[in-house]
Design a protein with these regions (language model features):
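Asparagine/serine/threonine-enriched low-complexity, disordered tracts
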Residues: 5-15, 22-26, 52
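Residues that recognize and position ribonucleotide moieties
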Residues: 30
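Acidic, Ser/Thr- and proline-rich intrinsically disordered linker/docking segments
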Residues: 46, 50-92, 100, 104-114, ...
Length: 212
C-alpha cells in the first residue's frame, strides 16, 4: 500500500536527484554518470555511490532515514535501468554491478557475520555485516550467480566460504593458527584450524584447487 508519507518521500527523492535518469549526481558540487558507479549503499541517512575502484564517489546526506531510503531505492532503480545488459544485484542496503565482482567470502568476527566482495585486483570493494548466520543465503546466492554466469573469470571454490577468480592469482599459506588465503599481501580469507593434521588437509585441498 502506498501511503501519503511514502509518496512524499518518493517526491522528495526525485527533487533531490538529477532529472536525467542516466546521471547519478548533478549539483553545484559534482557531476557523475552512472557509467562510473559500481555500487550504491545506504546507512542511516547516508546514501553513498561507490566507484568501480571501490572508493566513494559521492555521498548524499539526507534529512532523515525515510528520505534516504527513497533516494536509495530510486538510485538503485536508475542503476539497473542504465545497465540493462548487466546483472545488478540488490539487497536492503546494497546495490551493485556483478560484472565487477571477482570474489566473495564470508566469515565471522566479533560475533558478526561479514561478507566481502572483491574486485579483479583482489581488493575488498564492498562488504555487508549482520548477525551470525544472517548472510548465509546471500553468500550462497552470490556464489551461485558468479559460478553460473561468469565462466570467463574462472572462479575457484577455495573453501566453503571463499570463491575467488583465478585471474586475481591467489596464494595460500599455512600458519600456526590456520590457513591464510591472500592476493599479494592482501588477506582475502582465513580458516582457523588448531589440529595440525586437519590443517594440512585443508592446505592441500586449497592448493589443489588453485593448481587445477
Amino acid at each position: 500500500m502506498v501511503t501519503k508519507n511514502t509518496a512524499n518521500n518518493a517526491n522528495n527523492a526525485l527533487n533531490i536527484l538529477p532529472e536525467a535518469a542516466n546521471t547519478a549526481v548533478d549539483n553545484d558540487e559534482k557531476y557523475l554518470s552512472f557509467a562510473l558507479v559500481l555500487a550504491i549503499t545506504i546507512m542511516d541517512n547516508l546514501v553513498k555511490l561507490i566507484g568501480t575502484d571501490g572508493f566513494v564517489l559521492y555521498t548524499y546526506t539526507l534529512q532523515d532515514t525515510a528520505t534516504a531510503r527513497a533516494v536509495f531505492n530510486e538510485l538503485a532503480r536508475r542503476l539497473k535501468n542504465f545497465n540493462r545488459q548487466e546483472e545488478v544485484y540488490t539487497t536492503d542496503s546494497l546495490t551493485f554491478r556483478m560484472k565487477y565482482i571477482y570474489g566473495v567470502t564470508l566469515f565471522e568476527h566479533d560475533s558478526k557475520s561479514i561478507l566481502n566482495l572483491f574486485d579483479k585486483k583482489g581488493y575488498p570493494v564492498l562488504s555487508e555485516s549482520g548477525e551470525p548466520g544472517s548472510l548465509d543465503d546471500m553468500y550462497l546466492d552470490i556464489q551461485a550467480r558468479l559460478h553460473g554466469g561468469y565462466a570467463s573469470k574462472k572462479f575457484l571454490h577455495l573453501h566453503e566460504h571463499c570463491l575467488l577468480s583465478a585471474h586475481v592469482t591467489p596464494s595460500v599459506e599455512k600458519t600456526q593458527r590456520g590457513i591464510l588465503i591472500k592476493v599479494g599481501r592482501k588477506l582475502v580469507s582465513f580458516i582457523h584450524v588448531d589440529d595440525e593434521s586437519h590443517k594440512t588437509d585443508i592446505f592441500k585441498s586449497v592448493v589443489n584447487v588453485i593448481k587445477s
